[in-house]
Swiss-Prot record:
Record's signal peptide: 1-22
Keywords: Coiled coil, Signal
Any coiled-coil regions, as ranges: 26-57
Protein name: Uncharacterized protein 137R
Organism: Invertebrate iridescent virus 6 (IIV-6)
Amino acid sequence: MNEIIITIIVLILLLFITLSRNDRNNNQSNNGKKEKLIKCKKEVQQLRQKLDQLTFQ
């Protein structure tokens, strides 16, 4: 009986460890996506400025 209880507790702990790892990995990939998005927005802004300069010449 004690072995079953210990086994259940260990399985629950493993589940929580796995879930916390998944959350951490998701956060890291989201941060990478945000950085890429910010970089793309800056590039678009620069290209718009160049286009404005060319159209006003």
